[in-house]
């Protein structure tokens, strides 16, 4: 069984590393805040100090961090993966970053003697905990096949989208749909509240028909309860939407829904909601309409 490394043990990375351990992989981890790694020690993981050390001890190395510059620093910065890379190392970036940056990083890695895949995920913290993630993979087919046993320990739906950067492009398409769905659910619930109809009955009916969506089923009950604890933070949602806007600008695309929902999330951030869950978008619509959609 191949040795697996994890760099980045946040909301997503920690449960993903735990699932790799439970699947029987030998796992080495590192994280900027070392205390995040300690729970994994009791489960059999080895904790080291730098990405360089993780690379030296791993055959498959997963990065799960916030941004393109973060991934670049982990791969090619001081004490980075590149300094510990060995022939056969496959670095798998499961963060959500720029498709353009991803292609550049793949070229640089190949020049340094190791290979990469981009494999961003959808499913949030619950999907990571339950090993039920959707994994969108970009890169060469031979390396996708090699990584498949690891992917199967982390997710239920694994799709090879295409070459380097394709996984990231697919993830950004997903994020556009997620954000606009959140807006649709928010507007529907506020509309129902303003017209004075039963909110729970309305939610159940819409969730049973053509207006249903993952957000209507999973987020609407929390919206109505005023539970905005993050499964996926607004700040991270906005980072992803900015990446999508940048890619759209590069291709001269007019995506008005994307632009609108990005501006509405900006308003939520400005009001101090950046660390709330992305379902908190309903609060912006409530302020615009002067109506609150909550169950008694």
Where are the predicted features?
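Hydrophobic beta-strand scaffold residues
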Residues: 27, 47, 116-117, 158, ...
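Rossmann-like NAD(P)(H) cofactor-binding subdomain of soluble oxidoreductases
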Residues: 51-56, 60, 68-133
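Active-site-proximal catalytic alpha-helix in oxidoreductases
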Residues: 130-138, 159, 163-195, 206-218, ...
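Interdomain hinge/lid region at the active-site interface
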Residues: 164, 168, 212-280, 296
């Amino acid at each position: 069984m191949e040795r697996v490394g994890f760099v980045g043990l946040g909301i997503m990375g920690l449960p993903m590393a735990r699932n790799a351990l439970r699947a029987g992989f030998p796992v080495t981890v590192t994280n900027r805040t070392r205390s995040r790694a300690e729970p994994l020690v009791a489960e059999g993981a080895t904790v080291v100090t730098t990405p360089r050390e993780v690379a030296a001890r791993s055959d498959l190395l997963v990065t799960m961090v916030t941004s393109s510059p973060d991934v670049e620093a982990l791969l090619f910065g001081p004490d980075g993966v590149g300094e510990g890379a060995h022939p056969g190392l496959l670095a798998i970036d499961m963060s959500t970053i720029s498709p353009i940056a991803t292609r550049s990083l793949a070229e640089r890695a190949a020049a340094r003697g190791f290979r990469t895949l981009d494999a961003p995920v959808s499913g949030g913290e619950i999907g990571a905990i339950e090993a039920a993630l959707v994994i969108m993979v970009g890169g060469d087919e031979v390396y996708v096949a090699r990584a498949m046993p690891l992917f199967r320990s982390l997710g239920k739906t694994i799709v090879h989208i295409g070459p380097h950067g394709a996984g990231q492009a697919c993830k950004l398409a997903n994020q556009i749909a997620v954000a606009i769905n959140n807006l649709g659910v928010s507007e529907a619930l506020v509309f129902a509240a303003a017209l004075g109809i039963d909110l729970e009955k309305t939610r159940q009916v819409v969730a049973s028909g053509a207006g249903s969506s993952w957000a209507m089923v999973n987020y609407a009950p929390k919206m109505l309860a005023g539970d905005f604890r993050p499964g996926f933070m607004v700040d991270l949602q906005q980072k992803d939407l900015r990446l999508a806007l940048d890619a759209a600008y590069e291709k001269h695309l007019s995506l008005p829904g994307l632009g609108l929902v990005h501006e509405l999330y900006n308003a939520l951030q400005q009001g101090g909601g950046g660390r709330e869950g992305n379902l908190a978008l309903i609060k912006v619509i409530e302020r615009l309409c002067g109506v609150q959609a909550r169950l008694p």
